[in-house]
UniProtKB/Swiss-Prot annotation:
Name of the molecule in the record: Ankyrin repeat domain-containing protein 13D
Residue stretches making up the UIM domain: 482-501, 528-547, 564-583, 589-605
Keyword annotations from UniProtKB, A to Z: ANK repeat, Cell membrane, Endosome, Membrane, Phosphoprotein, Repeat
PANTHER family: ANKYRIN REPEAT DOMAIN-CONTAINING PROTEIN 13 (PTHR12447), ANKYRIN REPEAT DOMAIN-CONTAINING PROTEIN 13D (PTHR12447:SF2)
Transmembrane segments annotated in the record for this chain: none
Composition bias type Polar residues, residue spans: 319-328
Modified residues (Phosphothreonine): T556
Stretches the record annotates as Disordered: 306-333, 541-605
Location(s), subcellular: Cell membrane; Late endosome
Biased composition (Low complexity): 564-575
Positions of post-translational Phosphoserine modification: S552
Length: 605
């Protein structure tokens, strides 16, 4: 039998799972570990698809890229989940988070160095999560990211930490980045616990074994992935086009202008923005598939989204086949670039559904705004995108070739039912003064520096607050895959109308429905009130659901049970539809009245 051929030597060793020879070949440093075979797979992607755990372990030890996607847009971790192997998923997930952490170590000093050249400033980024579904819109939160920049130092304050276990995670945190000659200092300040976690990021990774061990996922996390569909959501902006919005009627239509945060802005629509969601279920048991379908069908039928189901229908399974090579593809066939596999493939046969929905993103661009998107704002978004999935989506959008001007406001889709609206405001405290920021006198050196909006930032905002405990970075918070959790939460909330879960919606209303532009109470007081409100509601819900003992006082007979989810949804949609029709009728009536007035005014002259 012939040995490995001269082409794709690492891939051929992976195919045969000859992991000891693979280890030796990698130690020689003579082969490209990221080389793609004729089917577009790297050695790691091939090893995962074939389920060759020993080869996967060797490649990961040699730092094969876990974050790479194949030609179909699936990441290595998603392919690992499709194998259904818990050990494979645990290993790939651990190294994925480890590689993200090391990239963070290398990237932060470079981003801070970029910021050093830019003028100092303070700005607020207001994030509002909105929805066109009436019931979902009630639970959408909002948050204001407050950003201070001075030299190589950056501070970002937030109270909306993320989304986990079907709830929005809140807490008062500050993220402080301070550039240094040999790297950077990162501080995460937890104002609720008065604790500061400090991490020094050098140009070289310290104690990689310790960091790798800290990234090991729990068994519950692995089990959750293996019993849930694989979901991929991304914005397809390949055909995006920007158009000026118009206002007015008939021959008086003009390009739309709006004032945002005190700046005149041109309003653009980004068309042909497609939100693509693909779901794979080949790794699920029949019970898990039934549970998944039962949770999604009413909502999907309500949205009316175009959905396509596809499954592998390749050649019949042959006697010599294995579960990861069901059509018995030979290595000679696989590695021959001129041989067509047609519908045959390696790996478990794919069961996938896909949804495509077109959206319009909206931008408000001001050519008068003094901030620079590339020099001042993009590095900050890059920093926050390391640990925040929403900032990562914003970064992907603003890196497009935008029309001229600074985006003072952006509205982009995050999921099929959720949009994010980001507004930049209070530049250098011009709207609401802050003690930590001031505009220098005209005679000062800062004012004479040529900066179109000179600003001085108090250096003490980048220091550890008095009385706080300082700890090392004992824990890690890798970038969360929030998309699927958020989508499922939106589905759950969209089906609610009455009962205890409706009171949970009231919690979010109480937490987030603040009047824009109003001066808020002190942040600590507001947050404490939020916690007390949530605790009180949780206790009341528990009391309402606890079983009653024999000696308990009689309770008022319960009202008839609430209708089914489908019935709730139908009623909610009917109400929403009637309201929408009424709004359209009023708008049409106003338009007709205006046209009659204009016609009369023209005939009189």
């Amino acid at each position: 039998m012939a040995g490995p051929g001269p082409t794709f030597p690492l891939h051929r060793l992976v195919w045969a799972n000859r992991h000891r020879e693979l280890e030796a070949a990698l130690h020689s440093h003579q082969h490209d570990i990221e080389q793609e075979d004729p089917r577009g797979r790297t050695p790691l992607e091939l090893a995962v698809s074939l389920g060759n755990l020993e080869s996967v372990r060797v490649l990961l030890r040699h730092n094969a890229n876990v974050g790479k996607e194949n030609r179909q847009g699936w990441a290595v971790l998603q392919e690992a989940v499709s194998t259904g192997d818990p050990e494979m998923v645990q290993l790939v997930l651990q190294y994925r988070d480890y590689q993200r952490a090391t990239q963070r170590l290398a990237g932060i000093p470079e981003l801070l160095n970029k910021l050093r050249q830019a003028p100092d400033f303070y700005v607020e980024m207001k994030w509002e999560f909105t929805s066109w579904v009436p019931l979902v819109s009630k639970m959408c939160p909002s948050d204001v990211y407050r950003v201070w920049k001075r030299g190589e130092s950056l501070r970002v304050d937030t109270s909306l930490l993320g989304f986990e276990h079907m709830t929005w995670q809140r807490g008062r945190r500050s993220f402080i980045f301070k550039g240094q000659e040999a790297g950077a200092l990162v501080m995460e300040v937890d104002h609720d616990r008065q604790v500061v976690h400090v991490e020094t990021l050098g140009l070289t990774l310290q104690e990689p074994e310790t960091l790798l061990a800290a990234m090991r996922p729990s068994e519950e996390h692995v089990a959750s992935r293996l019993t849930s569909p694989i979901v991929s959501t991304h914005l397809d902006t390949r055909n995006v086009a920007f158009e000026r919005n118009k206002c007015g009627i008939w021959g008086w239509r003009s390009e739309k202008m709006e004032t945002v945060s005190g700046y005149e802005a041109k309003v653009y629509s980004a068309t042909n923005v497609e939100l693509v969601t693909r779901t794979r279920t080949e790794h699920l048991s029949d019970q898990d598939k039934s549970r998944s379908k039962a949770g999604k069908t009413p909502f999907q039928s309500f949205l009316g989204m175009a959905q396509q189901h596809s499954s592998h229908t390749g050649a019949p399974v042959q006697q010599a086949a294995s579960p990861t090579n069901p059509t018995a593809i030979s290595p000679e066939e696989y590695f021959d670039p001129n041989f067509s596999l047609e519908s045959r493939n390696i790996g478990r046969p794919i069961e996938m559904s896909s949804k495509v929905q077109r959206f319009k993103a909206t931008l408000w661009l001001s050519e008068e705004h003094p901030l620079s998107l590339g020099d001042q704002v993009t590095p900050i978004i890059d920093l926050m995108a390391i640990s925040n999935a929403h900032f990562a989506k914003l970064r992907d959008f603003i890196t497009l070739r935008l029309p001229p001007g600074f985006p003072v406001k952006i509205e982009i889709p995050l999921f099929h039912v959720l949009n994010a609206r980001i507004t930049f405001s209070n530049l250098c405290g011009c709207d609401e003064p802050l003690s930590s920021v001031w505009v220098p006198a005209p005679s000062s050196a800062v004012a004479a520096s040529g900066n179109p909006f000179p600003c001085e930032v108090d250096p003490t905002v980048f220091e550890v607050p008095n009385g706080y405990s300082v700890l090392g970075m004992e824990r890690n918070e890798p970038l969360r895959d929030e998309d699927d959790d958020l989508l499922q939460f939106a589905i759950q909330q969209s089906l609610l109308e009455a009962g205890t879960e409706a009171e949970q919606v009231t919690v979010w209303e109480a937490l987030t429905n603040t009047r824009p532009g109003a001066r808020p109470p002190p942040q600590a007081t507001v947050y404490e009130e939020q916690l007390q409100l949530e605790r009180a509601l949780q206790e009341s819900l528990q009391l309402s659901t606890e079983p009653r003992g024999p000696g308990s006082p009689p309770r008022t007979p319960p009202a008839p049970g609430p209708p089914s989810f489908e019935e709730q949804l139908r009623l909610a949609l009917e109400l929403s539809s009637r309201e929408q029709e009424e709004r359209e009728r009023r708008g049409q009536q106003e338009e007709e009245d205006l046209q009659r007035i204009l016609q009369l005014s023209l005939t009189e002259h």
